[in-house]
Amino acid sequence: MSAKPIKVTITYCAECGYEPQTLEVAGAVMKTFGHEISSITLIPWVDGAFDVRVGDELVHAMERDGGFPKSETVLDAIRAQLAS
């Protein structure tokens, strides 16, 4: 594991059916980083939410950014935290 624990949190609208997008992002993180992150947390929510945090950084918010994030956006945020 990385010396610096990196936590990824995905808050998604369960009632909206956002599970496929959630699993796509989570799968990309797991496949790319595996043991380099300390946890991936999936939080079912409501109100159209789809937010992704890497550590304390909000890297995507559906309300702010619109739509779903590209997996590469999330992976780049993790790379940046690993490099810092």
Question: Can you say where each PLM-predicted feature lies in the sequence?
Answer:
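Short beta-strand
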Residues: 41-45
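Conserved short-loop catalytic and cofactor-binding motifs
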Residues: 13, 40, 62
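Short, thiol/selenol-centered motifs that function as redox-active sites or metal-ligating centers
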Residues: 3-29, 33, 46, 82
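Non-catalytic, surface beta->alpha helical segment in thiol-disulfide oxidoreductase systems
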Residues: 59-84
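A short acidic, often aromatic-flanked loop/helix-cap motif at beta-alpha or helix-coil junctions
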Residues: 48-51, 67
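A generic structural motif
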Residues: 33-39
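A short, hydrophobic beta-strand/beta-hairpin element that forms part of a small beta-sheet core
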Residues: 50-60
